[in-house]
Amino acid sequence: MSEARRDSTSSLQRKKPPWLKLDIPSAVPPTAEEPSFLQPLRRQAFLRSVSMPAETAHISSPHHELRRSVLQRQTSITQTIRRGTADWFGVSKDSDSTQKWQRKSIRHCSQRYGKLKPQVLRELDLPSQDNVSLTSTETPPPLYVGPCQLGMQKIIDPLARGRAFRVADDTAEGLSAPHTPVTPGAASLCSFSSSRSGFHRLPRRRKRESVAKMSFRAAAALMKGRSVRDGTLRRAQRRSFTPASFLEEDTTDFPDELDTSFFAREGILHEELSTYPDEVFESPSEAALKDWEKAPEQADLTGGALDRSELERSHLMLPLERGWRKQKEGAAAPQPKVRLRQEVVSTAGPRRGQRIAVPVRKLFAREKRPYGLGMVGRLTNRTYRKRIDSFVKRQIEDMDDHRPFFTYWLTFVHSLVTILAVCIYGIAPVGFSQHETVDSVLRNRGVYENVKYVQQENFWIGPSSEALIHLGAKFSPCMRQDPQVHSFIRSAREREKHSACCVRNDRSGCVQTSEEECSSTLAVWVKWPIHPSAPELAGHKRQFGSVCHQDPRVCDEPSSEDPHEWPEDITKWPICTKNSAGNHTNHPHMDCVITGRPCCIGTKGRCEITSREYCDFMRGYFHEEATLCSQVHCMDDVCGLLPFLNPEVPDQFYRLWLSLFLHAGILHCLVSICFQMTVLRDLEKLAGWHRIAIIYLLSGVTGNLASAIFLPYRAEVGPAGSQFGILACLFVELFQSWQILARPWRAFFKLLAVVLFLFTFGLLPWIDNFAHISGFISGLFLSFAFLPYISFGKFDLYRKRCQIIIFQVVFLGLLAGLVVLFYFYPVRCEWCEFLTCIPFTDKFCEKYELDAQLH
């Protein structure tokens, strides 16, 4: 039997042509440490074709090789919390998310802060941000493979032209790539590892018909009097073969099932290879092989594209002996033929789900943001430095972009709130000075007077300052009991305590005034206890009063009965909702027609007893139910929103973050949207919505708190502090990527120029520089604490942990100090206004109707 086999083998060897030589690698027995299906990975030369781009071969373990994992003890809650916290802050030792973050940071740095160092670019091998050029649709150039690498040489497929158009859907990016010629009946390891191999090239399932097409076909069948089912059955009967897509599950899945008949016998191999043109597969002569062995070592040009001149000289893309073209006479002699060692690829079709998944990946494909080279980096022409550590390179490659959900949500809220504010409260006069309105209005004395209303113009095209305060602007008197405002209200109540009802002699009306404002000739000032109508309290006449249209003797609700008698001080009297007597009480202050009631005017809690016409002209809040200013709380009317828990003590501290969602006008909102859709969106794609939201909100709150301390009587709106906190993130990102940037100082000064320009822009009205400064400082602290960054070693990792703790403590100390200054130790700063608004004219910064000096 063995002799017969030897005879057949020798006969096959005699039939083998002299130019054919095959080097079949011998099988290596599997070791005890590694599974057998991983052994082919040791020799990467047999995992791919030379005509294909190099890819990392990855073969999944077959199902029958999987073993049940050993039972392990479940991690404790403390360890889970500790690991999750380390992953969130980016200081975990073995966290995949940390590596992804670091690789993403490098990509962002390359876009935002300029070029990287050349070594960084070489080791990172970042993908190009440009679109696919037209050259990618042409035939890819042949690759050069050194002669000493397992005998693999140049392999040129003259039929490879136009492959980019045929296989562009194999990758998510749609990039073209050369493909190995398909040999039926065999499969290779590369066909399982490469997403660009011919493993995914079976005929696909027929696309399902759309609803519109099926509806149209059903309507046509009904018009013809046929059944839709009959047509479907007739079409199904035409098929006499099984669709190829139904056999996808029967294709080769694992290396154990590879068809090795291709490598079995030399005779069969020669018969199969003889069917291919000689122009494609060529082998060198023995003399040429000996010359190559004696030749000196060549430079490592593996994977490089051949020059056009070399291609023309060697005629690699043209048939050498026969074909559709002939070699030109006088041309250089072709290179000697070399032995071929090429991988054979299976013809298995695409896996299930690729038809839809690939177009979807193309649709949602986005450019990744290199760390430190985002949008601002592209504007400032930043680059990476030439050299970078391989550990840093891996961190950059692992980074993935986040979706900017917070930016989109914030932009939607800003736009919606601005539109509603403008529609409800209208637009104030546009400009940089003050707008004055003069009109003749009926006052509380019963005569018409010329009055003037002064309003600060708003160049942002938006509501007035009073409307913004009512909406939730940053305004200290609404957030705490301001000493000056409280003193102003107390002095007004003290004057009202000694007032009385002034009844005109012609019975035209009465109004609550002081003795100086009541004419002794034309009116009578009904003052208790001098006037005989004074009531008694505890056996003696009351010392303060009277009050127009209010008397404890005739009020039923609330009644003045022992032990709930009304106090001596009229400023503590309640509002009478029901009187027992009619219009005739024989008391002059009760039988007259009242012409003035309390009206809250301005934003400082000022109250006047005046007519409704005058109150409406001054844009005030008229109280028809009250008779004294002490019975109303003007600060509650001015501030709006939720009422105070104690009417005497404002407590709307939530204005610190509520004002971040308000804008002074349409232009102000557009500026914020532009900032958010460029800088904020770019950073959120790098760091994620949770980190950016924390930095954005806390920076804005800190900036508004500092502004409320130094500019307490100015209404400020907008996310000024938050925006400067986000700009601080750019500085932190620049500092963290300082070691990998080619020109870090240049990027630093460019970024500093942008911040100084925005700070100068804050000297205009309605823009708060105190919020800018405080938001920037707090943003620096928060960015150092919450933004993970690229680590350059174990020491740098430990330094990051200390940095997180230190900057969190510093930020909490800053926030606590500002809270103490705001609520317990108010600061009075006279020159602080010049830091946020320079008075170029006498009315350029005229207090916005919010005077720092209350009078």
Swiss-Prot record:
> What does UniProt give as the signal peptide span?
none
Q: How does it sit in the membrane?
A: Multi-pass membrane protein
Give the transmembrane ranges: 412-432, 656-676, 692-712, 715-735, 747-767, 773-793, 804-824
Recorded superkingdom:
Eukaryota
What the entry lists under SUPFAM superfamilies is as follows:
Rhomboid-like
Stretches assigned to the Cytoplasmic side: 1-411, 677-691, 736-746, 794-803
Query: Which InterPro entries would you find in this protein's record?
Result: Inactive_Rhomboid, iRhom1_2_N, Peptidase_S54_rhomboid_dom, Rhomboid-like_sf
Could you confirm whether the keyword Ribosomal protein appears in this record? no
According to its UniProt record, where is this protein mainly located? endoplasmic reticulum
The record lists glycosylation at 583
Its cellular-component GO annotations read: endoplasmic reticulum membrane; Golgi membrane
Keyword vocabulary terms for this entry: Endoplasmic reticulum, Glycoprotein, Golgi apparatus, Growth factor binding, Membrane, Phosphoprotein, Protein transport, Transmembrane, Transmembrane helix, Transport
GO process annotations (BP): cell migration; cell population proliferation; negative regulation of protein secretion; protein transport; regulation of epidermal growth factor receptor signaling pathway; regulation of proteasomal protein catabolic process
Q: Where is this region: Disordered?
A: 1-36
The Phosphoserine modification is found at 76, 176, 390
Question: Which cellular compartments is it found in?
Answer: Endoplasmic reticulum membrane; Golgi apparatus membrane
Q: Which cysteines are joined by disulfide bonds?
A: none
Lumenal side, ranges: 433-655, 713-714, 768-772, 825-855
Q: Does the keyword Phosphoprotein apply?
A: yes
Q: How does it assemble?
A: Homodimer, or homooligomer. Interacts with TGFA and HBEGF. Interacts with EGF; may retain EGF in the endoplasmic reticulum and regulates its degradation through the endoplasmic reticulum-associated degradation (ERAD). Interacts (via cytoplasmic N-terminus) with FRMD8/iTAP; this interaction leads to mutual protein stabilization. Interacts with ADAM17/TACE.
Q: What does this protein do?
A: Regulates ADAM17 protease, a sheddase of the epidermal growth factor (EGF) receptor ligands and TNF, thereby plays a role in sleep, cell survival, proliferation, migration and inflammation. Does not exhibit any protease activity on its own.
Q: Which family does it belong to?
A: Belongs to the peptidase S54 family.
Q: What is this protein called?
A: Inactive rhomboid protein 1
**Gene that this sequence comes from:** RHBDF1
